[in-house]
A protein has these predicted regions:
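Beta-loop-alpha module in the N-terminal Rossmann-like domain of NAD(P)-dependent dehydrogenases
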Residues: 69, 77-142
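N-terminal Rossmann-like dinucleotide-binding module
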Residues: 25-77
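Predominantly a Rossmann-like dinucleotide-binding segment in NAD(P)-dependent oxidoreductases
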Residues: 159-240, 244-248, 365
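Hydrophobic residues in well-ordered beta-strands that form the structural core
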Residues: 37, 125, 150-152, 293
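C-terminal helix-rich "cap/oligomerization" subdomain common to oxidoreductases
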Residues: 37, 99-101, 330-371
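Rossmann-fold dehydrogenase core element
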Residues: 138-156, 179
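Contiguous beta-strand/loop segments that form the cofactor/metal-binding neighborhood of enzyme cores
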Residues: 223-298, 326-337, 357
Length: 371
């Protein structure tokens, strides 16, 4: 009798545990984003593909017209034919994703928003938002009209070092009032580091990318400075550009220096395809000290009266700020308001204005006043 009773208890407990595990797996699966991909020509697409391989995201459709690219991705990631469409409108007639992720040329971002927004589908594009102010403002109009999110993804948004620097400077007032921000972003050059031919073709086309290093890397500094300056537009923008490797990049700049004027601070953006190694860092000077986000994890701090720098590792970011998928999920669920975040539409409208003014300044040799 006792043995039978124990067996029944064990069976019931096992059944309960099994049901619980199945339910947990189902909930977890439901929490994964269902995404559609617009374009495969931006090499950052490999990040989402890696997430797909790890079962961190559901890709329910891919819009790409280049048959060679389609075949390449189909074979490499074992993606079924049924997920591929020749264009985004056709895809969205058949599928209803949570969000569209754009991995196409910057000049094509507006078309992605025009296809998705009227259907109530939010969009995240790779940096920057657009190549012209007119395009960016049209995207903002569509976002407001159809009540969708238009977000921009930057690698540096998910750096724990940048997140911690912001908290120290803006919330803890560790170095006092900001007076200067310097941001360096660059590498040896896209061709030199071996980006794909499809990516290189539009990255070095001023009609598709807007410029060269000025846009490709200048956008990072404009994004971070707008964030640190509380979403304020700079008073003026000045810039100089160079074509150091004219034989490699004949149609666009490969080095840019951009100066942003604020009422009580100066921003300096250094962007290049000519550096001996890859770098993404940020320095901030305050009334009482200095901080540097040396890379994605390391910080450097020095206060007045101190002889040595304090060098330390940033704390791990909150889960929703650890990567673009977690952030997107939180935004779409209404768990956070992206109003002034690095990915926000308001921030990135200003970024596009800064880049447009920088191009004009470099062309004319004059300071451009922003209204």
């Amino acid at each position: 009798m006792m043995t039978t009773y124990l067996m029944r208890c064990f069976f019931r407990a096992s059944t309960f545990i099994l049901c619980f595990l199945l339910l947990s797996c189902t909930v977890k699966a439901q929490q994964k984003l269902n995404v559609a991909i617009a374009g495969l020509t931006h090499d950052h697409v490999y990040l989402i593909m890696n997430s797909y391989q790890k079962a961190e995201v559901n890709i329910i459709g891919i819009a790409e017209s280049n048959p060679e690219l389609v075949e390449r991705f189909k074979n490499r990631y074992k993606i079924p034919d049924s997920l591929f469409y020749n264009n985004l409108p056709d895809l969205l007639k058949k599928k209803k994703p949570d969000v569209v992720l754009a991995y196409n040329a910057i000049s094509g971002h507006l078309a992605v928003v025009e296809a998705a927004a009227p259907l109530g589908i939010s969009v995240m594009v790779e940096k920057p938002l657009a190549i012209t102010v007119k395009q960016a403002e049209r995207m903002a109009e569509l976002a407001a009209q159809y009540k969708v999110h238009i977000l921009t993804n930057y690698e540096t948004t998910w750096y724990p070092s940048n997140q911690e620097l912001y908290k120290e400077v803006k919330e803890s007032n560790t170095i006092g009032a900001l007076c200067k921000i310097i941001v360096h972003d660059g590498h040896q050059g896209p061709k030199e580091i071996g980006v794909s031919a499809e990516f290189l073709s539009w990255l070095t086309d001023p009609n598709q990318n807007g410029a060269g290093a000025l846009v490709d890397f200048g956008c990072y500094g404009a994004n971070l400075m707008t964030w640190l300056m509380d979403g304020k537009t700079p008073i003026s923008v000045s810039a100089i550009t160079h074509q150091i490797k004219k034989d490699v990049y004949p149609n666009v700049d490969d080095d840019a220096t951009i100066l942003l004027e604020y009422p009580s601070a100066t921003g300096i953006i250094e962007a290049s395809w000519n550096w001996p190694f890859s770098i993404k860092d940020m320095e901030v000077f305050g009334a009482n000290g200095y901080m540097q986000a040396v890379n994605d994890k390391t910080l450097r701090l020095k206060n007045n009266g101190k002889d040595d720098y304090k060098i330390y590792q940033a704390k791990t970011s909150k889960p929703i700020y650890s990567n673009h998928l977690s952030y997107l999920s939180a935004v779409l669920k209404g768990e956070i308001n992206p109003a002034n975040d690095l990915s926000s539409l308001s921030n990135n409208l200003i970024v596009v204005k800064i880049l447009a003014a920088a191009k004009k300044s470099a062309q004319t040799g004059k300071k451009v006043i922003l209204k």
